[in-house]
Amino acid sequence: MSPAKKPTKPIFNRIRLLRTERGLSRAQLAEIIGVNVQTVGALERSDHYPSLDLAMNLSEAFQLPIEAIFSRTEFTPMSTQIYQEK
């Protein structure tokens, strides 16, 4: 399961944030989603974008909907979102 080529429109992600929140290493996440460690690094850096299958595996691993992990627009910092909710 290799990442897909980059489309012309960027896809932003929260993979690194979600992985570290859960105390997972890149190697642990790679094992859970069935890819190699380098793929996780490339996804976190947005060097590559995931296939639909890989995006669904990440969604299952983090127990979040895909749109909570990936977006066509930049995510606002979590601290900003939390502050605005109060």
Annotate each language-model stretch with its function.
Residues 2, 60, 70-86:
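Short, charged recognition helix plus adjacent turn
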Residues 2-9:
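Short, Lys/Arg-enriched anionic-surface-contact patches
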Residues 9, 20-21, 48-49:
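Short amphipathic helical patch at the helix-1/turn junction of helix-turn-helix
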Residues 13-28, 32, 57, 83-85:
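Short basic helix-loop element that most often maps to the first helix and adjoining turn
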Residues 18, 32-33, 43, 72:
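Residues in the recognition helix of alpha-helical DNA-binding motifs
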Residues 34-49:
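Recognition helix of helix-turn-helix/homeodomain-like DNA-binding domains
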Residues 53-68:
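DNA major-groove recognition helix of helix-turn-helix/homeodomain DNA-binding modules
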